[in-house]
Regions:
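Extracellular/luminal ectodomains and secreted, surface-exposed scaffolds of diverse proteins
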Residues: 420-430
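Carbohydrate-binding surface patches
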Residues: 246-271, 300, 370-407
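Solvent-exposed beta-hairpin/edge-strand motifs
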Residues: 404-421
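Exposed aromatic-hydrophobic patches
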Residues: 403, 434-438
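Short beta-strand-to-coil "C-cap" segments at the C-terminal boundary of structured domains/repeats
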Residues: 447-449
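Glycan-recognition and catalytic regions of carbohydrate-active enzymes
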Residues: 234-247, 258-265, 342-384
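Glycan-processing catalytic domains of CAZymes
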Residues: 6-300, 304-333, 337-345, 434
Length: 449
């Protein structure tokens, strides 16, 4: 897509926020932060605002929602000097074609089933997602099939999307309506996306937005924590290019439930087992490199070349669990992003098979005292360094985290927002290398080499 507007920042480096004001003075809140792309409603559009934002190195995307005058709104945004358009909702191909022909940059933030995984799109984005955090039912933590508390997360879906697309991935899920959200939940939403290499389009609930614009001291302190985490992630943006490091691969695609939250990838992650998505459409030997186990969710969907990849995988010593027809999860439907009740019951059967297959084997990393956390294991392009993201979904710090990694490492360092990198002691274990982390507050990254 040719960019008619002069963008202040490369699209791949956009750090997006739904901004609640079109007042030029509100831009002061962005100074010194990593935020460089704001999405604003039509009522907030003005040439003065877009000009001031551009002078500050911030791109402004005008939010356009489905309506009969959507194209007119887009042209108005162009006339007012906005950087581009954020199409939020479902639009027909005529709107996309007209914007492209008019050389107006746009991102599409709509249903998961309409996500652009390839082609000329600027980003692959959706506005559908669960609100990350520990799922509670009547104040009691809901149990996952693995026995631990169930954590609502978008990571499985986002990991698949990252593996299936070369585009930047955004998720623009919103806080629960009419709910005052503690700042920790915003941090969890940012971390939930970031550890999968995606970005959450930061969106405030009304109370936070109003207090932020009013410069309420407590809200400003919360905003500082949000921007601190965003800055930390961007300071280490090179980690997005690292490949999945888990030894278990899940062969799955859009038509077998990969766009659904709460499915197999999430179930395995909740067990704290490193897992890598292997999109059927991209299945090749390189994708399976380093994997020792694989789950094929829909064997009937594979073509001959893809079947050959899995045959070679097993010939080279890999273990393959091919699911029966009853294991196949349905493709995502309009308005649905989580498993139906009948499909949830499938997870129990799949879990039992996976548990038998994996036993107590360490598939890259084994974590202890992390019931409120999720992790993601990555390997550097040269294969010499390993990174373990750690995200805490409780509103309180987690102390005394123990990590057992496969492989022999000589150095370990923990990175956390607002703290200097800290070298950690390592010790030999039967599986490879042990590391103890004193505390994880919200988000951390353990780097070993």
């Amino acid at each position: 897509m040719l960019l008619a507007f002069l963008l202040a920042v490369s699209v791949a480096d956009w750090v997006p926020v739904h901004w609640p004001s079109g007042g030029v003075k509100s831009l002061e809140l962005l100074k010194g932060t990593a935020v460089n792309c704001i999405l604003i409603e039509p009522s907030a559009w003005s040439r003065d605002f877009s000009s001031a934002a551009a002078n500050q190195g911030v791109d402004v995307l005008g939010v356009v929602k489905p309506s009969k005058d959507a194209l007119e709104q887009a042209r108005r945004a162009k006339d007012l000097g906005l950087s581009g358009i954020s199409l939020e909702g479902e639009f027909d191909d005529n709107v996309r074609k007209s914007l492209t022909d008019s050389n107006i940059p746009f991102v599409e933030i709509g249903p998961r089933i309409n996500m652009r995984m390839e082609g000329a799109a600027l980003v692959s984005a959706t506005n559908q997602g669960v609100w990350p955090g520990i799922n509670t039912v009547e104040d009691t933590a809901k149990a996952a099939p693995s026995g631990g508390p169930w954590i609502d997360t978008n990571t499985g879906f986002l990991r698949f999307t990252r593996a299936a697309s070369d585009l930047p991935v955004w998720i623009a899920n919103t806080p629960p309506p009419k709910t005052i959200v503690p700042v920790e939940r915003y941090l969890q939403a940012i971390g939930d996306a970031a550890m999968s290499g995606a970005r959450w389009v930061v969106t405030f609930e009304d109370d936070f937005a109003n207090k932020l614009m009013a410069r309420d001291p407590a809200t400003l302190a919360g905003w500082a924590r949000i921007t601190q985490l965003l800055a930390f992630i961007e300071e280490h943006k090179q980690w997005r290019a690292w490949r999945p490091g888990g030894e278990m691969a899940v062969v799955q695609d859009v038509n077998s439930g990969a766009l659904i939250s709460g499915g197999v990838l999430d179930m395995i992650a909740v067990k704290h087992t490193p897992v890598r998505p292997a999109p059927t459409s991209r299945l090749n030997p390189a994708l399976m490199k380093g994997a020792t186990m694989a789950v094929n969710m829909d064997p009937a969907s594979l073509n001959d070349a893809q079947k050959q990849v899995l045959r070679e995988f097993t010939r080279n010593g890999g273990s393959l669990l091919s699911g029966p027809p009853g294991w196949k999860f349905p493709a995502a439907k309009p308005g649905e992003i989580t498993l139906a009740k009948d499909d949830v019951e499938k997870l129990d059967a799949i879990w039992k098979e996976l548990n038998t297959m994996t036993g107590r084997r360490n598939l890259g990393a084994r974590l202890f005292n992390v019931s409120s956390m999720l992790s993601n294991l990555l390997v550097s392009p040269d294969g010499k360094r390993t990174l373990l993201y750690l995200v805490n979904y409780s509103n309180y710090p987690v102390d005394s985290v123990t990590i057992h990694l496969t492989g022999k490492f000589k150095r370990a360092r923990i990175y956390q927002p607002g703290k200097k990198p800290l070298d950690l002691a390592i010790y030999p274990i039967e599986e490879g290398t042990g590391v103890d982390v004193e505390q994880i507050k919200e988000f951390g990254a353990l780097l070993v080499e």
